[in-house]
UniProtKB/Swiss-Prot annotation:
This is V0 assembly protein 1. The keyword rRNA processing does not apply. It comes from Saccharomyces cerevisiae (strain ATCC 204508 / S288c) (Baker's yeast). Disruption phenotype: Reduces association of VMA6 with the V-type proton ATPase. Decreases VPH1 protein level. Accessory component of the V0 complex of vacuolar(H+)-ATPase (V-ATPase), a multisubunit enzyme composed of a peripheral complex (V1) that hydrolyzes ATP and a membrane integral complex (V0) that translocates protons. V-ATPase is responsible for acidifying and maintaining the pH of intracellular compartments. Functions with VMA21 in assembly of the V0 complex.
Length: 265
C-alpha cells in the first residue's frame, strides 16, 4: 500500500515536470541584446515593444544573429575567454528587449533583408558571405538552427561576420543578438528593456564585471525543476527506507511444525 502511494507520487511529480518542460518549450521566450552605433537611433525607438519593432525603426544597417534552438547565455561559461562576447555583453550592449515569443521580422522588410541559415558553422565567414552582394540590403539575418555550437568558434565566426559587414556599411552598424530564454534585468528590475543611461552607468563603473554579472545571473527553469525532482526523489527514498526498517518480520511461519505428542520410533 505504501509503495503504491509512493509510486503514485513519483508519477505525479514526473508528469508535472514534463508538463512544465513542454510549456516552457512551447512559449520559447527570447531576449535580444542590441548595440547601436548611432545616437539618433534612440529617438526612433522610444515606443518600442519588441525586437521586431527595433529592427523596423532604426535607420542604419542591421546585423541580426538569431538562435532558434540554442540559449546562448545559458551556455556561456564565466571562466572562459570569448573576445567578442565578453566585449559585446560588457561594453557594447545599449538596449535589452524581452519578447514573449520567438523573433518574427516583418515580411515588409524582405526586399531589404538577406537571410543566412547556419546549422553547422562554416570554416570562416568569407565562405558564407563573399558570394553574395549585400550592397542593396539593410538587414542581414543569420538564423542559427542547431541546438549546440562550439562557443569559441561561434565567437570567432560572429566577430568575422561583423568585420565584413562593417566594411560594407562604413562602420555604421546596429547589432542584434537574439537568444532563447532569460532576459537581462536592469537595476530597477525592469526586464523588458534597460535605458541607455542605466547601461552606460553599469558599463563605466563595473567594466569587465558587467559580463560576469550577466552570466552569473543565469538560472534556468529546467535546472530548478531538476533540483526539485531530485529533492522529492530523495524524500521518497528516505520514507521508503524508514518504512522498511520498521517492518517486524516474523519467521515463525517458516519453521517446520513438530508434534510433541508423536513418539520417536
Amino acid at each position: 500500500m505504501v509503495f503504491g502511494q509512493l509510486y503514485a507520487l513519483f508519477i505525479f511529480t514526473l508528469s508535472c515536470c514534463i508538463s512544465k518542460t513542454v510549456q516552457a518549450d512551447s512559449s520559447k521566450e527570447s531576449s535580444s541584446f542590441i548595440s547601436f552605433d548611432k545616437e539618433s537611433n534612440w529617438d526612433t525607438i522610444s515606443t518600442i515593444s519588441s525586437t521586431a519593432d527595433v529592427i523596423s525603426s532604426v535607420d542604419s544597417a542591421i546585423a541580426v544573429f538569431e538562435f532558434d534552438n540554442f540559449s546562448l547565455l545559458d551556455n556561456l561559461m564565466i571562466d572562459e575567454e570569448y573576445p567578442f562576447f565578453n566585449r559585446f555583453f560588457a561594453n557594447d550592449v545599449s538596449l535589452t528587449v524581452h519578447d514573449d515569443s520567438p523573433l518574427n521580422i516583418s515580411q515588409s522588410l524582405s526586399p531589404i533583408m538577406e537571410q543566412f541559415t547556419v546549422d553547422e558553422l562554416p570554416e570562416s565567414a568569407s565562405d558564407l558571405l563573399y558570394e553574395y552582394s549585400l550592397d542593396d540590403k539593410s538587414i542581414v539575418l543569420f538564423k542559427f538552427t542547431s541546438d549546440a555550437y562550439d562557443l569559441k568558434k561561434l565567437d570567432e565566426f560572429i566577430d568575422s561576420c561583423l568585420s565584413f559587414l562593417e566594411d560594407k556599411s562604413g562602420d555604421n552598424l546596429t547589432v542584434v543578438i537574439n537568444s532563447l530564454g532569460w532576459a537581462f534585468e536592469d537595476e530597477d528590475g525592469d526586464d523588458e528593456y534597460a535605458t541607455e543611461e542605466t547601461l552606460s552607468h553599469h558599463d563605466n563603473n563595473k567594466g569587465k564585471e558587467g559580463d560576469d554579472d550577466i552570466l552569473s545571473s543565469i538560472w534556468t527553469e529546467g535546472l530548478l525543476m531538476c533540483l526539485i525532482v531530485s529533492a522529492l526523489l530523495l524524500f521518497i527514498l528516505i520514507v521508503a527506507l524508514s518504512w522498511i526498517s520498521n517492518l517486524d518480520i516474523t519467521y515463525g511461519a517458516l519453521e517446520k511444525s513438530t508434534n510433541p505428542i508423536k513418539k520417536n520410533n
